[in-house]
């Protein structure tokens, strides 16, 4: 019989019909609607048990609702006797309906409150996708078993399957012949009676192998108790199953007896042991409340109640806790062998047949010790060092010395180890000594190579090497250092400190680092580019050395130790590309005194003025101690130094003899409470502008020193000297004082919370300096400077809310902020073809790598397939930018090599001239004023006149150096370097010509280094080219130098636009036009200009630093064979001339210079040139 087929869109028609019926019903009178509704209720009575899953639910309590409504209405009418108007009746009906609704809601809530759902088997949504542990799976299975539900985990085993051959003979034999010397620990409360025949115990029992225990506390308890034998317990637990059938009745009688009789013990003990063993297997942890009251007895007896198992479990738990705590149980054991072993040999055979289970601790809970680390065949070699007592005492005060044993064990057991220790823990100076004393670098040991320690800064490498050589008394000749311009390496060197760039250079010649047995990478948390590349290479070298040592005994494994001052090591330890197995991490506590952190209530925009006010209050109110102020740049440092000197330095004003009482700061308390009370209103002090700063003759004098990277070495070393007597030292520094340098006696730190960073836009190649918030890790580093010698205080010039919301946790790695073409060239030289797959700790991104490869292709270092060319191989020999390396290689023409060396060195160092801002601060210095302004009495007028004179001399000096070629500003640097070499008094020469003496010293050192490299790799170079004092270049040499510069910067070309009155760059710069840097005057009238770099100012305008002008003909010749230059079709005139039977042709074409990056890049037509083309496979190709 067929079914009634549903019509199309039946539900839609039903809804439409229902709407029509509702509208029709709404037009009826209310009394008629009420009659119809009541008739419907009577016609369709609702059953008591209504299906809640039905599609339509009919309202059941309508009759009750009407009845209740009528009762309320009668009650209210009775209370309000008299006539009620129709309006009040309507309001009364509405009131009754609202009241009924409230009563229904209240009853519904009461019903819901009575209904409860068991949520024990429910899980939180946040744990979705998370794999449950064995303990959680067992707990869930037990609950499902208790509730009578099917087990969700099919692998869960709640019961132990035992096959027992129950024969009367074996049962009676087991009862009468129980082992005499088989006894358990006194904490169990069980004993065995003596038997006569022990050889008849041959039970036929199949026992499933138990699962491994995962309870660490149980394993620790067993390890702490030397008398406990886990195999004996397993033996007793398996024997007890033979007596399970005969022990049902006796268990009830003896459950409360700790020392039962011999007869009862024969029946009771095995059952108790089985119950306890079953409970032990089912309980994830002994103290869990959900399992303590459960009955997990696996015996077949039905008379044993859950109370017995609970009582026995509690007794076992109390014994286990007492054993863990080492307490005396109070019960004496009976018949326990002294060595806790079974004397019967037959019983030993039984035990071996039953394969007792041995309990082990989890690997993650075991802390490796010297006994746990297995080092096979290691030859022990050590070096004894006799240090003076004062050095030994200072070493013992360092936290890392206490961890020497643990550190060396991990180094011997692992090839890679990470050590985290805050600044001041002693890891940099002590770890090389640990390795040296343990036999590293000794020819007789298994690690005969040197110990290499890399530092990101040259100053740190030199200073640490000197410190380690002082501590290694008698072995000071074993410690050496090698930096860019200096080296003390000798044949006896065993510990070598160097910059990370030096080690990278050594990798290009010796990739396996066969001369080293251990490499220590220090300051890895700074994430410099060289450090990241070095770690990526070392991760592969360590693996290669380990594999090669297995087949060749001459090759020894390499040990890599990564040291970080912060806990930011997840980029190394959790990076599977670097280390497939995470290396162990050792954390060392720092020798740090407590530092109190004080935030501002509000963050003031003028942090320079706020820093001045803070320093003034600290100097006036707080006890003795040096002050360290962190600012963003040289300009702010000099300005604050000027304000503080004007306020507290007496040389600015004549001293006034005035009797006053001064409390010595040495006698003042340094307690935190006193300090808080003194600085309580520190944010409410009114600020004063720098122009209104006056000398304070009531305060003690202050010794103010600046510290930034552009200072001379002599001026930088002043911060390590002691201040004059009666003066408080105040050091105003940039972030150079944040790491590497430890300034003594710093008690107070004033932190502005900002730093000036160079931001590089990889799309536009525009650089700009931005003042940004530092990271939280850097803020902690700055605060830690105040806790080196004693309790200190750090005053942060920002609020805690800004610190929490605006400060990043860590700063970006340097590899994400700088160009990487130099690193890519070095990796190409190491035969690393696929650089994208290199194990960077933080990948720079595929786009940046492709951009660097394109630049190397334009420079001719690699071909179109990415293979290193001969020119690229020569460029990789120099520790310079690829642009400068190319200048050195092609600059051997016309005798220009000496000038190219000097020019490359000057461009590498850059900033040979002082900045215009420093001229303003020199004008305020009384010692640097000229004789012309001495006759002026007014200080402000005197400062303005002095500034004008200095600006006039500044531009005159630049004009003198540019006289060699006004169209090539880069040659002014060459002129300054050559003039410096001829100066007898170099300091006076730099001061008169507004040059930075420190920069020129670095240029001289770099020239010497480049000359040394050229002597090593280029034997054809004449000796005359290596002189430092050079004669002025000829006109031909000047033209050649300009082309050398343009060849190295062929992609950084700008064309002058007359309509826009500015230059347009070849690659988009983000600005329509760019202008010259306004620091100097340029006399360039050429159409095409090659520039050094682009800079964005605070106003958003883009400026360029020009190098030289270039003609379009030279530009077309230099851009040949690059992706920047293409040619048009042959011109019709002059006509084409065919050669060699029409296989070649000579024609004129228009060169087109473009960036070839798609839409938006300009293309410039250069003057037509004549070229020769050859026909290959039907196409004309340029020869």
Swiss-Prot record:
GO terms for molecular function: ATP binding; ATP hydrolysis activity; helicase activity; RNA binding; RNA helicase activity. SMART domains: DEXDc, HA2, HELICc. Its EC number is 3.6.4.13. ATP binds at residues 421-428. SUPFAM superfamilies: P-loop containing nucleoside triphosphate hydrolases (SSF52540). Transmembrane segments: none annotated. It is found in: Nucleus, Nucleolus. Its main location: nucleus. Residues 224-251, 292-308, 673-683 have a biased composition (Acidic residues). A motif (DEAH box) lies at residues 522-525. This is Putative ATP-dependent RNA helicase PB1A10.06c. It comes from Schizosaccharomyces pombe (strain 972 / ATCC 24843).
């Amino acid at each position: 019989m067929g079914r009634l087929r549903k019509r199309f869109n039946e539900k839609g028609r039903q809804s439409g019909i229902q709407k029509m019926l509702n509208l029709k019903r709404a037009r009826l009178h209310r009394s008629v609607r009420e009659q119809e509704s009541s008739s419907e209720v009577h016609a369709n009575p609702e059953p008591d048990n209504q299906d809640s899953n039905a599609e339509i639910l009919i309202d059941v309590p309508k009759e009750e609702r009407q009845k209740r409504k009528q009762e309320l209405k009668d009650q209210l009418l009775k209370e309000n006797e008299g006539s009620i108007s129709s309006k009040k009746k309507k309001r009364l009906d509405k009131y009754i309906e609202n009241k009924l609704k409230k009563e229904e809601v209240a009853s519904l809530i009461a019903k819901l409150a009575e209904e409860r759902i068991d949520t024990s088997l429910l899980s939180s949504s946040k744990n979705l996708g998370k794999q449950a542990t064995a303990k959680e799976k067992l707990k869930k299975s037990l609950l499902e078993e208790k509730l009578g539900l099917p087990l969700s985990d099919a692998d869960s085993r709640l019961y132990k399957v035992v096959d027992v051959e129950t024969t009367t003979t074996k049962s009676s034999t087991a009862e009468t012949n129980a082992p005499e010397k088989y006894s358990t620990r006194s904490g169990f409360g069980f004993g065995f009676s003596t038997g006569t025949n022990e050889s008849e115990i041959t039970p036929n029992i199949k026992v499933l192998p138990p699962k491994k225990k995962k309870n660490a506390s149980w394993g620790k308890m067993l390890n702490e108790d030397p008398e406990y034998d886990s195999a004996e317990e397993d033996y007793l637990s398996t024997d007890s199953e033979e007596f399970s059938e005969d022990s049902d009745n006796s268990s009830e009688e003896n459950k409360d007896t700790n020392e039962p009789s011999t007869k009862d013990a024969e029946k009771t003990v095995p059952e108790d042991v089985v119950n306890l063993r079953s409970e032990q297997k089912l309980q994830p942890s002994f103290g869990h409340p959900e399992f303590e009251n459960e009955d997990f007895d696996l015996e077949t007896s039905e008379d044993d109640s859950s109370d017995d198992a609970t009582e026995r479990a509690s007794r076992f738990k109390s014994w286990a806790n007492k054993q863990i705590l080492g307490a005396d149980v109070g019960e004496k054991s009976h018949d326990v062998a002294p060595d806790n072993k079974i004397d019967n040999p037959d019983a030993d055979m039984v035990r071996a047949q039953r394969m007792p289970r041995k309990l082990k601790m989890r690997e993650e809970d075991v802390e490796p010790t010297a006994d746990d680390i297995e080092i096979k065949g290691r030859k022990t070699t050590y070096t004894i060092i006799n240090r003076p007592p004062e050095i030994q005492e200072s070493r013992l005060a360092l936290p890392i010395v206490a961890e020497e044993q643990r550190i060396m064990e991990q180094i011997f057991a692992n090839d890679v180890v990470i050590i985290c220790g805050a600044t001041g823990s002693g890891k940099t100076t002590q770890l090389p000594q640990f390795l040296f004393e343990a036999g590293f670098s000794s020819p007789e040991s298994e690690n005969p190579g040197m110990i290499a320690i890399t530092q990101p800064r040259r100053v740190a490498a030199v200073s640490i090497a000197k410190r380690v050589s002082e501590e290694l008394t008698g072995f000071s000749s074993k410690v050496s250092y090698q930096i860019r311009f200096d080296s003390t390496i000798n044949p006896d060197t065993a510990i070598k400190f160097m910059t990370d760039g030096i080690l990278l250079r050594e990798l290009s010649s010796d990739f396996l680092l066969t001369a080293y047995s251990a490499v220590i990478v220090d300051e890895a948390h700074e994430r410099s580019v060289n450090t990241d590349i070095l770690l990526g290479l070392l991760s592969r070298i360590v693996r290669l050395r380990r594999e090669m040592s297995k087949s060749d005994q001459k090759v020894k494994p390499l040990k890599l130790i990564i040291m970080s001052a912060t806990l930011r090591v997840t980029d190394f330890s959790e990076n599977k590309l670097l280390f497939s197995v995470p290396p162990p991490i050792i954390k060392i506590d720092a020798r740090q005194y407590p530092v109190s952190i004080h935030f501002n209530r509000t963050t003031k925009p003028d942090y320079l003025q706020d820093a001045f006010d803070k320093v003034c209050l600290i100097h006036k109110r707080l006890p003795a101690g040096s002050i360290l102020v962190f600012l963003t740049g040289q300009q702010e440092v000099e300005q604050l130094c000027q304000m503080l000197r004007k306020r507290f330095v007496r040389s600015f004003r004549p001293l006034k003899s005035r009797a006053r009482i001064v409390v010595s700061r040495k006698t003042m308390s340094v307690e935190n409470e006193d300090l808080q009370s003194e600085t309580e209103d520190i944010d409410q002090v009114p600020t004063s502008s720098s122009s209104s700063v006056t000398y304070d003759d009531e305060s003690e004098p202050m010794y103010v020193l600046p510290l930034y990277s552009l200072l001379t070495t002599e001026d930088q070393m002043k911060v390590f000297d002691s201040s004059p007597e009666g003066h408080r030292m105040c050091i105003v520094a940039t972030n150079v004082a944040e790491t590497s340098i430890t300034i003594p006696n710093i008690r107070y730190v004033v932190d502005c919370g900002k730093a000036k960073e160079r931001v590089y836009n990889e799309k536009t190649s525009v650089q700009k300096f931005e003042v940004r918030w530092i990271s939280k890790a850097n803020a902690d580093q700055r605060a830690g400077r105040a806790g080196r010698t004693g309790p200190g205080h750090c005053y942060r010039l920002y609020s805690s809310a800004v610190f929490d919301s605006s400060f990043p946790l860590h700063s970006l790695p340097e590899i994400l902020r700088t160009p990487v073409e130099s690193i890519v060239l070095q990796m190409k030289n190491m035969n690393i073809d696929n650089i994208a797959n290199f194990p960077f700790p933080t990948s720079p991104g595929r786009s940046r790598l492709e951009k660097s490869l394109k630049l190397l292709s334009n420079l001719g270092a690699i071909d179109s397939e990415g293979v290193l060319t001969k020119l690229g191989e020569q460029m990789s020999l120099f520790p310079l930018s690829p642009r400068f390396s190319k200048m050195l290689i092609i600059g051997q023409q016309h005798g220009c090599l000496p000038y190219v060396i000097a020019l490359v060195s000057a461009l590498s160092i850059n900033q040979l001239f002082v900045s215009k801002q420093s001229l303003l601060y020199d004008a305020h210095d009384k010692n640097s004023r000229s004789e012309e302004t001495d006759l002026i009495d007014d200080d402000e007028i005197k400062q303005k006149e002095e500034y004008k004179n200095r600006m006039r001399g500044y531009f005159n000096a630049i004009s003198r150096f540019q006289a060699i070629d006004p169209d090539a500003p880069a040659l002014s640097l060459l002129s300054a370097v050559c003039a410096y070499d001829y100066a007898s008094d170099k300091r006076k020469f730099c001061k008169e010509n507004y040059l930075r003496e420190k920069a020129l010293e670095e240029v001289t050192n770099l020239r010497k280094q480049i000359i040394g490299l050229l002597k090593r790799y280029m034997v054809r170079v004449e000796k005359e080219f290596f002189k430092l004092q050079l004669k002025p270049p000829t006109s031909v040499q000047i033209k050649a130098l300009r082309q050398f510069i343009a060849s190295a910067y062929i992609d950084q070309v700008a064309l002058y636009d007359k309509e826009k009155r500015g230059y347009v760059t070849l690659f988009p710069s983000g600005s329509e036009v760019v202008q010259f840097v306004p620091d100097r005057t340029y006399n360039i009238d050429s159409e095409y200009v090659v520039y050094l770099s682009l800079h964005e100012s605070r106003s958003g305008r883009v400026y360029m630093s020009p190098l030289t002008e270039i003609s379009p003909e030279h530009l077309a010749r230099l851009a040949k064979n690059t992706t920047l230059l293409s040619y048009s079709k042959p011109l019709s005139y002059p006509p084409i001339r065919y050669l060699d039977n029409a296989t070649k042709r000579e024609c004129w074409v228009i060169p087109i210079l473009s960036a070839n990056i798609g839409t938006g890049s300009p293309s410039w037509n250069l003057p037509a040139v004549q070229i020769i083309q050859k026909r290959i496979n039907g196409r004309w190709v340029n020869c």
